[in-house]
A protein has these predicted regions:
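HhH-family (HhH-GPD) DNA N-glycosylase catalytic core used in base-excision repair
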Residues: 1-290
Length: 290
């Protein structure tokens, strides 16, 4: 295997430590606890050729050092790592959202330097959207982990060509829908760079063409899988509840999010992260308390 190391200047606030802590608690695809101190390490499928790559990221002030190791296209692997960590976003205007919205100012203060992360690609986000249908998050996370243990590569989710061939014995139409996701990924319908180049609403409509992906799943693929910074998750009931709690009864997501542009996704992720920190809704599910 070969290694490629890239230094990338990060524009705007970023904390590797905060982002790593967020990802480690991200229930759908939690980051493993194998990273060394002051680093973030993860293994993933590279969209360009579906090879497997290991990435190790460190921070030196406003510079991210991304070291990728694998047998495939390492330039693409490094670019993808920058995207799934949101290091490719010019966030110098993020502080302006805080000036316009005191709720987001508080969120930024509590999660200093957080940049949304979690899914390595739209393909993995789409697979999660299928696996989590009609299941609790913790149940779906266990199912995903079992698939990786049995069919993955060094901890990475199976590539789409392999997923097409697998008979996972999943309930309902999950197997059919996963194969549709795999076929779409191979056809380029779930390409992260392509989805990022579209307007978010257009990208969501395009993803809706994939069998098995409804409105919530399509938004997840675009906003969290492609890591689009300025989209609006309109099918997130926990976010809606947080809007009511933070902004008051009668206030709507559409109304309050006008002040969040061009970082609506980021603001929504911050509010959801703080809600989980406060309520432990998902964690309580994992411990069988709800």
């Amino acid at each position: 295997m070969r290694t490629r190391t890239v230094d990338r200047e990060v524009q705007g606030p970023w904390s590797l430590a905060t982002s790593r802590e967020f990802w480690e608690g991200f229930a759908p695809a939690a980051l493993g606890g194998h990273s060394e101190p002051d680093t973030l390490s993860t293994t993933y499928r590279v969209e360009a050729d579906w090879s497997c790559a290991d990435a190790t990221v460190t921070q030196h002030e406003d510079t991210a050092t991304i070291a990728v190791t694998g047998d495939g296209d390492l330039d693409e692997a490094a670019d993808q790592a920058a995207r799934f960590l949101a290091l490719d976003v010019d966030a110098r205007g993020w502080i302006g959202v805080a000036r316009r919205d005191p709720v987001i100012a508080d969120a930024q203060a509590q999660l200093p330097g957080l940049r949304p992360c979690g899914f390595h690609s739209p393909y993995e986000a789409a697979a999660w959207a299928v696996l989590s249908q009609r299941l609790r998050i913790v149940q779906a996370a266990r199912l995903r982990a079992e698939i990786i243990d049995r069919h993955g590569d060094r901890g990475a989710f199976p590539g789409p060509a392999q997923l097409l061939r697998l008979d996972l014995g999943l309930p309902g139409r999950k197997g059919e829908y996963l194969r549709a996701v795999a076929a779409a990924a191979l056809d380029g319908q779930l390409d992260g760079a392509a989805l990022r180049s579209m307007e978010p609403e257009q990208a969501v409509r395009a993803v809706r063409d994939v069998k098995g992906l409804g409105p919530f799943g399509a938004e997840l693929v675009v906003l969290r899988g492609a890591n689009v910074p300025d989209g609006l998750p309109t099918h997130e009931r926990r976010l809606d509840a947080e809007i009511t709690e933070r902004y008051g009864p009668g206030r709507t997501l559409t109304e309050v999010s006008a002040a969040w542009r061009p970082f609506r996704t980021w603001a929504a992720v911050h509010l959801r992260a703080l809600r989980e920190r406060r309520t432990h809704e998902i964690d309580r599910q994992s411990r069988g308390l709800v």
